[in-house]
Every structure is written in C-alpha cells, then in structure tokens.
Amino acid sequence: RCDYNIINYCNKYFYDNKLIVYKEAKKDSMILVYNDKGKYVDSDKVSFVNLREIITIEGLINSDIANKFIITPFKNQANNLCEKYSKERCGTIHTFQGKGEKEVYFTTVLNNTSEGRKHLQGNHNLFTNELINVAVSRAKDKFVLVTDRNFFFENDKNVKNLIEYIEAYGEIIPDKTVCIFD
C-alpha cells in the first residue's frame, strides 16, 4: 500500500529487507521539514507540546486535512492538533495503528531543551523502533517529518536513521515559517 521509499525505509530498519516491495519510488514521497532555530517545548511533566511545529504543519497543509493524518508521539501535541482539526485526522501514533492515509505528517515535538533531553534519556522514550515504524508506515503516498533535525541527529538513533534515510532518498525543506517562538 505504501510508496516504495516509504515502505523501503521500514523494510531496511525493521524487517531485515524481507519485504517484497511492488510500488515504484517517487522522489517527493518522503520529506524532511526541519527547524533548528526555535527552542520551544511546553511540558506538564507527562507529555509535551510544540506550538511552533503545529504552526509549521498549518502552513504545509493549508487547512486541507482531507486524505491526511497528523501524527505525534505526545498526547498534549495531539490534543492541540485536534483543537484545530478533527480527531479522526490527528492523534498519537497509537491512534492510527492499523490505519493508513495518502499523506502523513509526523511532528516529533521535542527540541534542544532540558525537557526534550530528559525525555530521550528516560525509560518512557516514545521514539522506539516499533512506534516509528507505525508512524511511517501509515503513509501511502507521502510521509512528511517535521522535526528539529540537529537535536534528534545528536540525541536519538532511531529518529536519526529516519532523517538520514529521508536525506538520501527524499526531499529536504528548511522550515521558513515566521513564528514568535524563534
């Protein structure tokens, strides 16, 4: 069901190249939208929200939520997204287990703040292989990663692998959104 580049990422990192992929690759099927400027994450000690990444996603989808899922590991980010879009279109990774859509936007939320670093070092790190596999493989035609590239490149192997894969086989777009959090 997925574009070649999307399912090939999962095949390479999670299935030991045992999947047989029948779809052809499109260059724009995997996109990295990165911002390394704004260091804003709000936390209630249980979950996180990054309004800057929400604003970025708003600019990317232009209010057209049809055929799109917006996925995040964090409940607070999902709740904020659901206030803007329908609950059927936004949620945590677990929300979309077993579902698929043409486009998936994955907001990683964390950046180089003490809260972000603590989360990645803790026992409840939500960037496991299993969860990243679910997030990526929900996308049929396009997967868009909205993230702080440098932070994850330095602090999380699993997201770093995803970033490197997109940089090799997809498109890289610096986020040019003007935001009060920068």
Task: Give, region by region, the residue ranges found by the protein language model.
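Conserved nucleotide-binding/hydrolysis micro-motifs of P-loop NTPases
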Residues: 1-4, 75-78, 96-97, 110-113, ...
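Conserved helicase/translocase motor-coupling segment
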Residues: 17-84, 89-90
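Helicase C-terminal subdomain and adjacent C-terminal extension
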Residues: 11-13, 21-30, 85-88, 113-182
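Conserved motor-coupling elements within RecA-like helicase/translocase cores
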Residues: 82, 90-104, 111-113
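Structural motif
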Residues: 69-71, 105-107, 136, 144
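Active-site proximal loops enriched in glycine and acidic residues that flank catalytic Cys/His/Asp
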Residues: 34, 72-74, 92-94, 107-108, ...
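Hydrophobic, well-ordered secondary-structure elements that form the walls
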Residues: 6, 57, 70, 98, ...
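A short acidic (Asp/Glu
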Residues: 7-8, 76-84, 101, 155-157
